[in-house]
């Protein structure tokens, strides 16, 4: 036992090595491993928040990998939005000129959209609508900043138990500047083929547009509807075959604009194919959703809507107002001046160190005044050894230490620009976020109430619609109303977003995570089976799942993730759009997730 504990302590000490900021975080567990390094769940002892800390090993071993990491940390600092994953901090290295590893502190997310789709065949129309709404909202913000993600796929969209989605992994993203060749042709495009726009399959167009991300979102949404990838091509030719099998052969003027001669010849010689009606391909989907999906998947990029136009589609009529969705100022060309130069490893090290200092304002000021003198900080190994020894003695029951104030604050954009909010406007429903749920029920058998911070006993869970044997899922999370719209102007530092949707109404769906124990799961399953069936039965999606290809190194194998689609307010009260605003889900047995920068 003692040797095991010593081995554990040694691993934890090796995780942080000599990084001074390590004193601030208490490691909980390793949640992901890969060729890049390790991801750990931890507690921020200054705030009490749970975070994910990604250690990226040997950042400067390859210049291309170092550039990708630099690009991503810079973009995530500049793009602050509730639907984009947030870097909370980057730990300060012990030396400016000698550090090899970096530690990036993210907000902790329980799963990703790939796992949600893979493990659930009972997602409702309300889930479909809310998922697409969040993805398009993130795209609108990115595209107004002239940023193209270029690698959107379910594994790069993180998910929480309350159905909150956040886009991550900006390593392949690019900023478009009108006077640079990067907006004309990108030769380094290596994104996942299944979600790649047709104009990228053969390098069709002479100039790429934000429509490449719109296509990817369409493919992801189709996968949400059916539970399996829409175009799982095995090669570029096979990919084009699958696309044309559904959409039909493109128009002659579209083919004429194809850049790649072989691809152009292949499409011209292809037999005539007709468009397959989307109602036939997706028989259980909302007709309004299919009409929007068909626009997102237009073969010609000029025929696809922008993210803002898609948000204005009748499919989202009562979910939010497009004019209130936040936009971002275009990113300055100077931020990505390094993309135009040939950089050495030392150059990139200097630039990454400069990005790290953005999360340490006082040190950044000192650094700028001293023209780049290095900073050395004492090792945190002794402090961590005491923490883990204390946890072992107390069986891990110690609570986080929460000082009243944070010592450092990051330096993102000071504000996100959005239209003014009328103080006399109708009270709004929080359509994108809800209060976080507790990871497990308290020892006294109560869960926090999201409406008034009161507690209530846990009752037997309701029967899960379309439940499977041995599968236990609880109910869902609350959406909180905000009665003071004067405070509802968008703030980039918060993850709440308010939209004018419904009259003020508090909903208490009582969501909590079940502890991952077999005995409790069996007991809950017995109780759930004894309850009467709810009136609302979600639409069943295709349960067929494809083989999992190209597994994400950040995501470990896991049990199924469960989602309960039960709505607590009948659709007759608010109508389908109102029901969409309160559709949420609860996950169990959550595995590790990725945060980009592979």
From Swiss-Prot:
Alphabetical keyword list: ATP-binding, Kinase, Nucleotide-binding, Phosphoprotein, Serine/threonine-protein kinase, Transferase
Keyword GTP-binding in record: no
Biased composition, class Low complexity, residue ranges: 414-425
PROSITE patterns to which the protein is assigned, alphabetical: MAPK (PS01351), PROTEIN_KINASE_ATP (PS00107), PROTEIN_KINASE_DOM (PS50011)
CDD domains: STKc_TDY_MAPK
UniProt region (Disordered), positions on chain: 396-486
Coiled-coil stretches: none
Catalyzed reactions: L-seryl-[protein] + ATP = O-phospho-L-seryl-[protein] + ADP + H(+); L-threonyl-[protein] + ATP = O-phospho-L-threonyl-[protein] + ADP + H(+)
Keyword ATP-binding: yes
A GO MF label: MAP kinase activity
Chain positions of motif TXY: 187-189
Free-text description of this protein's post-translational modifications in UniProt: Dually phosphorylated on Thr-187 and Tyr-189, which activates the enzyme.
Modified residues (Phosphotyrosine): 189
Domain remark text: The TXY motif contains the threonine and tyrosine residues whose phosphorylation activates the MAP kinases.
Name the record gives this protein: Mitogen-activated protein kinase 19
Protein's organism: Arabidopsis thaliana (Mouse-ear cress)
Taxonomic classification: Eukaryota, Viridiplantae, Streptophyta, Embryophyta, Tracheophyta
Gene: MPK19
């Amino acid at each position: 036992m003692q040797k095991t504990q010593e081995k554990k302590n040694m691993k934890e000490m090796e995780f942080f090595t000599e990084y001074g900021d390590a004193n601030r975080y208490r490691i909980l567990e390793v949640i992901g491993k890969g060729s890049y390094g390790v991801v750990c769940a931890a507690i921020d002892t200054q705030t009490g928040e749970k975070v994910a800390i990604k250690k990226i090993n040997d950042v400067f071993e390859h210049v291309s990998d170092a550039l990708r990491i630099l690009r991503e940390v810079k973009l995530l600092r500049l793009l602050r939005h509730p639907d984009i994953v947030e870097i909370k901090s980057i730990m300060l290295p012990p030396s400016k000129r000698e550090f090899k590893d970096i530690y990036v502190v993210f907000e902790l997310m329980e799963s990703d959209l790939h796992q949600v789709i893979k493990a659930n065949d009972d997602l409702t129309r309300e889930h479909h609508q809310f998922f697409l709404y969040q993805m398009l909202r993130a795209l609108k913000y990115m595209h107004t900043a002239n940023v193209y993600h270029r690698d959107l796929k379910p594994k790069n969209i993180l998910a929480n138990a309350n159905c909150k989605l956040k886009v991550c992994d900006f390593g392949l993203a690019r900023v478009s500047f009108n006077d640079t060749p990067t907006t004309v042709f990108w030769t380094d495009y290596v994104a996942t083929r299944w979600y790649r726009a047709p104009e990228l399959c053969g390098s069709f167009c002479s100039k790429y547009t934000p429509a490449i991300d719109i296509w990817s979102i369409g493919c992801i949404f189709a996968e949400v509807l059916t539970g399996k990838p829409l175009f799982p091509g095995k090669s570029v030719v096979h990919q084009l075959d699958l696309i044309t099998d559904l959409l039909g052969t493109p128009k002659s003027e579209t083919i004429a604009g194809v850049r790649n001669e072989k691809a152009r010849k292949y499409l011209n010689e292809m037999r005539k194919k007709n468009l397959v009606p989307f109602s036939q391909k997706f028989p259980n989907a909302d007709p309004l959703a299919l009409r929007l999906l068909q626009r997102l998947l237009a073969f010609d990029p000029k025929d696809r809507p922008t993210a803002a136009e898609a948000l204005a589609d009748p499919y989202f009529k009562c979910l939010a107002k497009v004019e209130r969705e936040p936009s971002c100022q275009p990113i300055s060309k100077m931020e990505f001046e390094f993309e135009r130069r040939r950089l050495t490893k030392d150059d990139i090290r200097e630039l990454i160190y400069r990005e790290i200092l953005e999360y340490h304002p006082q040190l950044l000021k000192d650094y700028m005044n001293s023209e780049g003198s290095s900073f050395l900080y004492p090792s945190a190994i002794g402090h961590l050894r005491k923490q883990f020894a204390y946890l072992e003695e107390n069986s891990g029951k110690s609570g986080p230490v929460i000082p009243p104030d944070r010592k450092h604050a990051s330096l993102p954009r000071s504000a996100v620009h959005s239209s003014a909010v009328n103080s006399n406007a109708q009270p709004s429903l929080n359509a994108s976020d809800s209060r976080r749920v507790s990871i497990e029920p308290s020892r006294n058998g109560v869960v926090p109430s999201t409406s008034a911070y009161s507690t209530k006993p846990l009752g037997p869970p309701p029967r899960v619609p379309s439940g499977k044997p041995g599968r236990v899922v609880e109910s869902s999370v609350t959406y909180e109303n905000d009665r003071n719209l004067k405070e509802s102007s968008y703030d980039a530092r918060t993850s709440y977003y308010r939209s004018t949707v419904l009259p003020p109404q508090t909903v208490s769906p009582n969501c909590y995570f079940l502890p991952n124990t077999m005995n409790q799961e069996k007991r809950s399953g017995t109780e759930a089976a004894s309850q009467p069936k709810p009136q609302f039965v979600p639409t069943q999606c295709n349960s067929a799942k494809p083989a999992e290809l190209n597994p994400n190194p950040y995501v470990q194998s896991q049990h199924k993730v469960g989602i309960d689609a039960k709505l607590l307010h009948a659709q007759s009260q608010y109508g389908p759009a109102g029901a969409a605003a309160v559709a949420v889900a609860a996950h169990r047995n959550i595995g590790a997730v990725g945060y980009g920068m592979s």
